[in-house]
Amino acid sequence: MSFKKILGVALVSALALTACKEEKKAESTAAPAAQAPAKIKVGVMSGPEHTVAERAAQIAKEKYGLEVEFVLFNDYALPNTAVSKGDLDANAFQHKPYLDKDSQSKGLNNLVIVGNTFVYPLAGYSKKVKNVSELAEGAVIAVPNDPSNLARALILLEKQGLIKLKDNTNLFSTSVDIIENPKNLKIKEVDTSIAAKALDDVDLAVVNNTYAGQVGLNTQDHGVFVESKDSPYVNIIVARQDNKDAANVQNFIKSYQTEEVYQEAQKHFKDGVVKGW
């Protein structure tokens, strides 16, 4: 091969190598700009709990660059299924006894607890009495009908001296487990989401903070009696086995478990919340 041909081949190779390097450099420079910001989709209940969670979203954005999208629910039927199927990355609305029962009944075997939020105490509310001693013979008391919150409400009624249960440590007690009922109270099981709205039709209703807050009630100003702060029913953040350690999930937890979010919860629930972390 002549010297000119060798020189030509070398020149073409050098130009190709330079072009390749420039292309890779351009790709390397452009890559960060093409990356989408970190995101997470979380299911929460509408009302005050959503407002509290929005404060966590602000912190997540400021500290971790995490965009939080909330999907709002009005009842407890769908959020766990949505996480299990991958429609949501996580949810924050329930306590462990509810998760256990819901997962068992629906066959949701991929859900895991990744963090705690708050204890939201149950309380008894009434438009007719200000003290349980004023409840008349045969008074009607509305309680949530989902298994975990039904037992929780019955245990709370027992602590007020209104009934006695066969086993007050059973977190899934039902009305048939009432062994003493001195005032012959009528225990009316209603959908958890409408318990607060039943106050016009019953003498007293046991309601959780989620739904009490939706109708403007809080434990401090309106509760006839309130669940004690040592309640084991701490609310939780739930994700899946396959994403529980993901950065977006972990950063959302860290954003929620902050003093700022606690203060926001105190503001909306009037001291009716207890830190769960």
UniProtKB/Swiss-Prot annotation:
GO terms for cellular component: cell outer membrane. Its main location: membrane. The keyword Oxidoreductase does not apply. Residues 1-19 form the signal peptide. Keywords: Cell outer membrane, Lipoprotein, Membrane, Palmitate, Signal. A lipid is attached at C20 (N-palmitoyl cysteine). PROSITE patterns: PROKAR_LIPOPROTEIN. It is found in: Cell outer membrane. It comes from the Bacteria. It is a lipid-anchor. It holds the Pfam family Lipoprotein_9. A lipid is attached at C20 (S-diacylglycerol cysteine). Belongs to the NlpA lipoprotein family. This is Outer membrane lipoprotein 1. It comes from Mannheimia haemolytica.
